[in-house]
Amino acid sequence: MPCALEHIHTRYLGEQPYEPTWTAMRTFTEERSSETRDELWLLQHPPVYTLGQAGRPEHILDTGETPVVHTDRGGQVTWHGPGQLVAYPLLDLRRWGLGVRTLVHALEQSVVSLLAAYGVPSHRREDAPGVYVDGAKVAALGIRVRRGCSYHGLSLNVCNDPAPFERIHPCGYAGLTTTRVHDLGITTPLDRLEVELGIYLLQAIDAASRASRHDRA
């Protein structure tokens, strides 16, 4: 069975514009073969609102001059910007024995584990994917699977401007509040949290893969 820490190549990409990154993810997924190494991209985006395939325009209240991009991920509307960590796992799910739901849970678990390491309890919600602390959303998810391979992923609010979330119904839920890692008393620098998130995500993929294979044995 492959080990995620050894077989998934992690790339730290800094701040990258959203649309070229989206194009690069699609191209990587379309052109990959059964031999292509999986990758994990960790980065930030300049300010942008993205609307998923299930997105409804009424959940966008007033985006001002911030661009809105209609994308092919699952989910509704969210915001990306500086101070928010984004993780895009580009995986051949068959290689890891994962389904879409299992991948979503692994992404959520990576954030739950990260926050738990700092003594902050968090939880997922079956009716609204993501990670929550005392009812406030700290991490959002949206993925796409093509030919058994995933792209898009997870965003974690760390020290970003919270105001842009007031201009939308985050993830399609009116009145949903958001929070940030730094609001939770965690002052670890962003670049260190990025590394830690990547490690916890790879560990969560490993754990989900082992559980999936055990269930089928």
From Swiss-Prot:
GO biological process: one example: protein modification process
Principal EC category: transferase
PROSITE patterns in the record: BPL_LPL_CATALYTIC, LIPB
InterPro entries linked: aa-tRNA-synth_II/BPL/LPL, BPL_LPL_catalytic, Octanoyltransferase, Octanoyltransferase_CS
Domain BPL/LPL catalytic: 34-216
Active site (record annotation): C171 (acyl-thioester intermediate)
Keywords of this entry: Acyltransferase, Cytoplasm, Transferase
Site entry: Lowers pKa of active site Cys: K137
One GO cellular component term noted in the UniProt record for this chain: cytoplasm
Pathway: Protein modification; protein lipoylation via endogenous pathway; protein N(6)-(lipoyl)lysine from octanoyl-[acyl-carrier-protein]: step 1/2
Binding-site residues, substrate: R73, G74, G75, Q76, V77, T78, W79, H80, A140, L141, G142, G153, L154, S155
Compartment(s) where it occurs, according to its Swiss-Prot or TrEMBL record: Cytoplasm
Chemical reaction(s) catalysed: octanoyl-[ACP] + L-lysyl-[protein] = N(6)-octanoyl-L-lysyl-[protein] + holo-[ACP] + H(+)
Family, as annotated: Belongs to the LipB family.
Function: Catalyzes the transfer of endogenously produced octanoic acid from octanoyl-acyl-carrier-protein onto the lipoyl domains of lipoate-dependent enzymes. Lipoyl-ACP can also act as a substrate although octanoyl-ACP is likely to be the physiological substrate.
Miscellaneous comment text of the record: In the reaction, the free carboxyl group of octanoic acid is attached via an amide linkage to the epsilon-amino group of a specific lysine residue of lipoyl domains of lipoate-dependent enzymes.
Protein name according to UniProt: Octanoyltransferase
Species annotation: Halorhodospira halophila (strain DSM 244 / SL1) (Ectothiorhodospira halophila (strain DSM 244 / SL1))
Taxonomic lineage: Bacteria, Pseudomonadati, Pseudomonadota, Gammaproteobacteria, Chromatiales
